[in-house]
């Protein structure tokens, strides 16, 4: 389990089209390193989808007192089970103002990057094709190879390693 680098993380959900039908992607982003620390994909926009992404994030990162988890006001994030899971880990909830996408700009930016660099250049026949491609993009490219201006043009894994030693 990795060390917690930031007291801030954010979650959101986006939609990817395939010839087989839609695929939803829920992510949790570490706002310090821009690492995607949790994600889940599914055919339905449900509380369980967001909860699976959060569970992965909690598995990948230790939580600390005062950790702030930001999301929009979607029913998946306001759901009792989701809020209970945050509370059980001592995580403070923050939610965007109604109708204000700017409040979750970091995750929206990630989704824009994912779609510009990957999704818009593909024609997914099946949801499984999209899932595999998105998994590889996040795990192999985005977290380990993609450079970020916010991080001084480091990639997330490099930035975390360098700042952990400082």
Predicted regions and their residues:
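Charged DNA-binding/catalytic regions of mobile-element recombinases
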Residues: 1-166
